[in-house]
Amino acid sequence: MHYAFSRIRLRSFFGWMIIGLFLTMIPLGLSNVSESTMEVISQITIFFVFPLFWLYVKTNKNNVVFNSFFDKPGRLPWGLIVLATIMGMIFSVGISHIQFYILAHTLPNFLVTMLEDGTVINTSNIYMTIFTFISACVLAPIMEEVIFRGFFLQRMAYKWGIKKAVIISSIIFGLGHFDVIGAFMFGVVMCLLYIKTKNIWTNIAVHALNNLIATSMQFVGGEESSAISIPELQLQSNLWIGIGLTVVGLLWLIPYVWKQWSTVKEVSVPPVRFINEEKVVSASPENEVYSQVIVTDRLMAVELPDEAVNKLRLEENDYVTVAVEDDKIVIKKVHDR
């Protein structure tokens, strides 16, 4: 848990995203640009540039090096990346089949309307086709992983603890996608993967590979289709295929989540670097951090600066040892007590 994120608030993010939406769409609506150009500019600005620029400004203001989100502490675990992608997609496809079956037999008219208005990749324009691939397989994975796993997870871990942070950030991630259940599970796996590897590039690789497969599948079914009838829709739905695929996906997802969940509090969120740490080479009166002494009826306490708390990765109810060495106080985190 990093106390720098105590001052970077979620409501600020959502508020500025709404402002960014208006700042982008109003000028575009008043201009004479084509529909495809408007789509490209709006998607890049609203869903990539604005969120990352906001986070860049906020992290720099709060002494966090923005580039530390992209630190690569080790080699990418390609075996885990491929396995997580495949099993996650199997689960998502299975859940989608189950939802499709339920809607086809309970709300068929709603499903027909949803499919007819659904997003199908337009292959008639080569430039839009290329942009769709870049947006889905490059821009979206980078933005979503940095925002949801890099920022949301850090902020929520500070506010509610790491386990609640995994759940709540994944719920928000799921609500932003059509397949809410599949996206929620994907979000949980991505959070645990980030905590385990401490490498956002692992998440970006899984996300990019997942989107590449999903986008390619859209291309396969991207041709214009005739009107969909309700009887035909109900015949196409297959509950047992959905159940089978979901079970296959869960055979890997449940053990993985269970194993990582049991150690998530001890491992905690990945560390970030601080601007002052990079600029300061040696201690001097100009860069000393002053801490306040607090006296109560029972004890005297010294407030630790954010840099010390983050360096030791301290959380509520953790224990530390305090030792006096010459004229210095040495504080160490106790891992086993």
Question: Where are each of the predicted segments found?
Answer:
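Membrane-helix interface linkers and caps
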Residues: 1-5, 41-86, 106, 254-269
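Alpha-helical transmembrane segments in multi-pass membrane proteins
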Residues: 12-63
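Juxtamembrane helix-loop-helix connectors linking adjacent transmembrane helices
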Residues: 32-38, 67-140, 158, 268-271
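Hydrophobic residues within alpha-helical transmembrane segments
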Residues: 139, 168-172, 205, 209
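C-terminal membrane module of polytopic membrane proteins
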Residues: 208-281
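Long, compositionally biased stretches
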Residues: 271-296, 316-337
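Short beta-strand-centered segments at strand-helix junctions
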Residues: 299-313
